[in-house]
Amino acid sequence: MHRYRSHTCAALRKSDVGSTVRLSGWVHRVRDHGGVLFIDLRDHYGMTQVVADPDSPAFKMAETVRGEWVIRIDGTVKARTDDTVNKNMPTGEIELYAREIEVLSAAKELPLPVFGEPDYPEDVRLKYRFLDLRRETLHRNIVKRTEVISAMRRGMSDIGFTEYTTPILTASSPEGARDFLVPSRIHPGTFYALPQAPQQYKQLLMVAGFDRYFQIAPCFRDEDPRADRLPGEFYQLDLEMSFVEQEDVWDTMEPMIRAIFADFADGKPVTDKFPRIPYDTAIRKYGSDKPDLRNPIEMQEVTQHFAGSGFKVFANMIATNPKVEIWAIPAKTGGSRAFCDRMNAWAQSQGQPGLGYIFWRKEGEKLEGAGPLAKNIGEERTDAIRTQLGLEDGDACFFVAGEPAKFYKFAGEARTRAGEELNLVDRDRFELCWIVDFPFYEWNEDEKRVDFAHNPFSMPQGGLKALSGDDLLSIKAFQYDMVCNGFEIASGSIRNQSPELMVKAFENVGLSQADVEEQFGGLYRAFQYGAPPHGGMAFGIDRIVMLIVGAKNLREISLFPMNQQAVDLLMGAPSPATPAQLRELAIRPIPQKKD
């Protein structure tokens, strides 16, 4: 028999009754039932119940073991009685009667309980992550993450993609976030950068004559911590294709990603055909470029119903500013004054003056609008709004007014809030869609200039003619995102492979041809030697797994994450370098002034 085990803790079944076996694992918990000891023994694969009665030669040792000790047990497999069968465990029809117990490793008093998975301070969980990872839910999430990545690799291979790895040490480039810099010992005073994404390398692969590239790529960005992003690093399914238009990318990747969700969704419905929603439409309907389509609320413009109306606040705004619009947020079943007042109070807590509303109720046989706005605009306009929005008795509608560019985000948040408060969101499904036709440029208010809205390497719709025109902010890009349940899970584009277009695109944001050659020299040179039309995208693996397993945040699907202050509490990173290391790198730290 093997030194440590003949079976795993998930392997034994009723067919093994009578067998002598050896198991090794962690003591999940110990229970004393009338002098008989029950030990739940756990390993990576599962759990087995071990029994040690007073007559067993292993009983004295069993009395000494404690939670999370690592032990080896020899014993005989016996069937449980019908009334003690545990149908929730794969091994629930048997138990192991212990004959011998060996302690392989004792454990100190635990700073973090494993059994029961109670809520515990996150810093403790991260400092003792090796204990936290023993918890069933987190352990299962990590295994699921690996399974999803394996399925992605198989899926990409099945549709003709080949995995290539690109460099980790590369040159710094302005791609939207700060780089993590690595000092060069051989070339003092110079630095490598960890890649924010393999963007330029994968495009260079297409220029080099490869096709259908993919990799599971680590990406590094020195960003301020955010709730929906892990500090430091993340992983993406990165891909690129040659001789394609954007529809080719969509038609290739949609079935593959749908299959990933369907295979791991535990029976939850997954969108069959992903809708393709233009960016402008998404903003106007949902107030977001990553809408949660499980929420059925769709906003509509109702400006005409308030123009010249008795509600002077809106009417005067419309009369004095042609950019002003009134958007309606219909709320099915929200027709109570209490709910409307709650929404209004929430809006004020968000720094807004309030949230105007109308709700409808039957008075006898007549359906009437109620609330201050209804009184001010009158019955005819109120009923016209109800008819346009398809609202009925017991429904409500909220209104947001102003220039859409300034209020659409708040309107989207109000839509989300109403949907959640009214339980309109079906949480047991995956709703996926494409967001397409993103703006190529946007206005940088801080610097008072035009800037790239998203990926500077995207192909602008309209080509050089559009880039040379006067209305740069109207240019759309051949750029697209994939969204699931309100989260952006992928982004991509058809690339700009023309040196002339590349220079012009950057000139419009204030960079010269010399700047382009300095910052993107490799790509710029490559495009002068025969570059095929190409495009691709990248999927955020961590977010996809988070959605699949239903985790609350990304740390629940990551092995050894940093905390929100970008500190690795387990390994003690970041940490000071030694004087000798700094000398080798020709670096002298500058003392930081304390506030």
Swiss-Prot record:
A single BP term in Gene Ontology: aspartyl-tRNA aminoacylation
Subcellular location: Cytoplasm
SUPFAM superfamilies, alphabetized: Class II aaRS and biotin synthetases, GAD domain-like, Nucleic acid-binding proteins
PROSITE patterns: AA_TRNA_LIGASE_II (PS50862)
Cross-referenced HAMAP family: Asp_tRNA_synth_type1
Function: Aspartyl-tRNA synthetase with relaxed tRNA specificity since it is able to aspartylate not only its cognate tRNA(Asp) but also tRNA(Asn). Reaction proceeds in two steps: L-aspartate is first activated by ATP to form Asp-AMP and then transferred to the acceptor end of tRNA(Asp/Asn).
Protein name per its UniProtKB record: Aspartate--tRNA(Asp/Asn) ligase
Organism of this sequence: Sinorhizobium fredii (strain NBRC 101917 / NGR234)
Gene behind the chain: aspS
